[in-house]
Amino acid sequence: MAELSPEFILNMTSDAKVRIIVEKIRKLSNITTRPPEMTLYNDQFDPEQCPGTLLPFTCYVITGTAGAGKSTSISALYQNLNCLITGATTVASQNLSRCLKTYCPTIFNAFGFKSKHINILPRSVPRRTLDTIEQIQNFELCKYWPILTSIIQEFSKKKNLGQYSSISLAAFNMLAKMTTTLWTTNVIVIDEAGTLSSHILTAVVFCYWFYNSWLNTPLYRSGAVPCIVCVGSPTQTDAFNSTYNHIQQKYNIMECDNILSFIIGNKVVSEYISLTNNWALFINNKRCTDPEFGHLLKTLEYSLKISPKTMEYIDRFVVPKAQILNPLEFLGWTRLFLSHAEVKSYLSSLHTALVTGTNVSGAKLFTCPIVCEVFTKAFNEYKSHVNLPSLTATEWLSKNLHRLSNYSQFIDQDMTAIHTETTDTSTKVTYLTKYVKNTYISLNGKTKKCVCGYVGTYKNFKKILESESFIDSHANDQPEFVYSFLCTILYNSLYNFHNYGVTEKNESYLNDLANLKLPENLTHLYTQTDLDIEREALMLEDDVFYHMVSPPPTASSASLPCLISWYTALKDIFISRLKLATTWFSNKFLDREFTSFTINMLVRDNIEFTSTNGRLHGLLEYASTVESYKLQGYTFLPVNFGRSQTTVISKDLQDKMPSIVVQDSSGFIACLEKNVNKMLETLDDGKSFHLCSAGDYGISSKLAMTIVKAQGTSLDKVAICFSNHKKIKVSHIYVAISRATNPNHIVMDCNPLKLLVNDTQSISSQHIIKALNNPNTLLVY
């Protein structure tokens, strides 16, 4: 019998306690109350002027050391309860989606927050004594009310009042199984909740009650109290509040309570939710099972005294800073930095190394334009409102570049302004950004992709066909399009076998290839005599298949049974040709590169995908936020992504931008839709200005990232640069180090613990230590 791994044993020891967590949350979700009156929350309502009613909620808290199994325990909730699984950040939601194999939104998406709300800033509310849960809720609601007002107004326009008033319980339960939202379940799970400001908790509770009241759902009618499951670590990265100063044109950023420290540290809140009975603490690190590494994480998690032995242990990871900053060292490792500027600087140095011709594991540098358009009329109105008459469009762009797109990693990119054009209507600026082929990227939002080809080996493509894995993962809604796509790929790929024989000048192989039997359903217009005559008339350089078989029908011109018949026949031909090729050229043929596209494709300079065809077509679907895609290049071919985006940006700017081409883990090639969004500037008086539209590609490099972005991820190889920052926090060290899955694959430029010897214990750590000694707290080892 094989020896059981430490990871398996640790997970099995957690099993019984995880079952208890599920049952406790199930009981909390069954609590009902008299539903609060929500009609008072209208356009005229303002919580600062008139406090609202108590919005009841329950809460279950899951905390613990990084990698201890907090996030993976969410899968038990997903399997056993009807619950809405969300992440606090895009990275957290992507990791959840990967674990659960389903789409998990961010909590912001779940309660209706959109990109246009980014620049609506929370209020600054004066501090005051808060003795009751009602006062605390109203205080938190006041902060976020400008955003919540916009969200509920939009929801009220899209959804009919009383939409589910007459729905039966059976029909509603069916709806809940089909789609999980704030109005189909009262269990809301938030992973990495420690990164969220405290007012987000009240925002989620408010939106739950408002949405269910507006729709008059069975949940509202029965008074089902929302159960918010907060997962994370209060001692990891801090939460921040930001306010934008329009006069100075800069953000003022301040630390604030995160949801977990708010729940744990606020006596009124912790007593309201009965925290001592609704708190699970995960103890052992399962991401990396090295005992010394686990002890290091516990020391940081609980702010324990740092022993000389711990100091010596972390000294092992220290290497010269120059090695980490050198892109030719630690190839394939993810660099972690404290600031966006450092990420950008590292990427620039990597790109410089590629420009000078230094070989970095076969990587190749290419550039793509990013475009911005500032609208003159709106910009002049904005300047007048904020009393900045001398501010120019280019000055505003330089100061607000980091705010132009809808994700924080936009500013990390190595980009340079190369062209500015000013007209009466707008100022157009084009930037050039650098990317590296064959490096991995992640997507930052819901992006359409057009799957248009495959690049891999014959062996791997054969496995895909035989397992039908592509069909299983793509043919849920409209299988006819999936079969049509595969038919086209197979049909176009069969020439590869003939072309190889011509290249090798193997006439015997070509004769055998020409005499392979073709399925009758593809050649029904010909008699056997016709086929024999056609074969005899052709030269060896001609592939008989394409003379006998016309291209497969499209999804819109044939029925599903017809397309399946075509797919089965073409797959049989592919397998028979592959078998013949391996007979003639041995099994080494299976490892040869296999390429096929929906059109005749040429790749210029190994980067630009082009064709004599006027348009690139393929299988249209949404790109996975779960998967890491490998950059392959770009194409200027027109790609049909269905309904076009409505965001305003000049056509000449859009035409400058190509579509990024990526490869998924299976080998399929796809084009990504461009990320075009508009920037709304919202002033304190509620006045909004559509100042700018920006177009980029919505992708982030996995070569380097900030420590904050890395929270919630597991990284195989990590190189951390703490640099010379004067205010390194325990939370920074904790998050960065705990990303590692193997202590043999982690390096850093210094021992940051030496700067923290006199660091005071955090309030959250004090509460956690008390909880460890509380018999009512559930400890999961």
From Swiss-Prot:
GO terms for biological process: DNA replication. One of its GO terms (cellular component) is host cell nucleus. GO terms for molecular function: ATP binding; helicase activity; hydrolase activity. It is found in: Host nucleus. Its main location: host cell. The keyword ATP-binding applies. Keywords: ATP-binding, DNA replication, Helicase, Host nucleus, Hydrolase, Nucleotide-binding. It is an enzyme of class 3 (hydrolase). ATP binds at residues 64-71. Its EC number is 3.6.4.-. InterPro entries: DNA_helicase_dom, HSV_HELI, P-loop_NTPase. Associates with the primase and the primase-associated factor to form the helicase-primase complex. Belongs to the herpesviridae helicase family. This protein may be a helicase and is required for replication of viral DNA. Component of the helicase/primase complex. Unwinds the DNA at the replication forks and generates single-stranded DNA for both leading and lagging strand synthesis. The primase synthesizes short RNA primers on the lagging strand that the polymerase elongates using dNTPs. Possesses helicase-like motifs and therefore may act as the helicase subunit of the complex. This is DNA replication helicase. The lineage of its organism: Viruses, Duplodnaviria, Heunggongvirae, Peploviricota, Herviviricetes.
